[in-house]
């Protein structure tokens, strides 16, 4: 059912909301290749409750992330970028299948996304001037 991937775990078919899980409703929807109308995946049909749970999970994780030194945050983001680059082919295939676009464009989108993660990884250590944390509301 899934596109030919070297790492099938790149398409987990669940939401990452603190942990990998199904939509609260239990509903799913099929993802098909618009070029062939072939179903290649099934994913959670997430709703407002899932969005709220994601916001709550992010809010709960914030104090821990906030305490991580900038150099360590940069290393985490760099590692994420390295993983994106390492799996560019599989991620490009997923984008190509989901959107019905040429594989070269899917690969290009992954490279473009990677450039943003790389930029933020580098910016994490470039805090110039005074850094005043915003209050969490």
Where are the regions a protein language model picked out?
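Glycine-rich loop-to-alpha-helix module at the N-terminal edge of alpha/beta enzyme cores
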Residues: 40-127
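Terminal low-complexity tails and localization/encapsulation signals of metabolic enzymes
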Residues: 1-42, 75, 79, 127-137
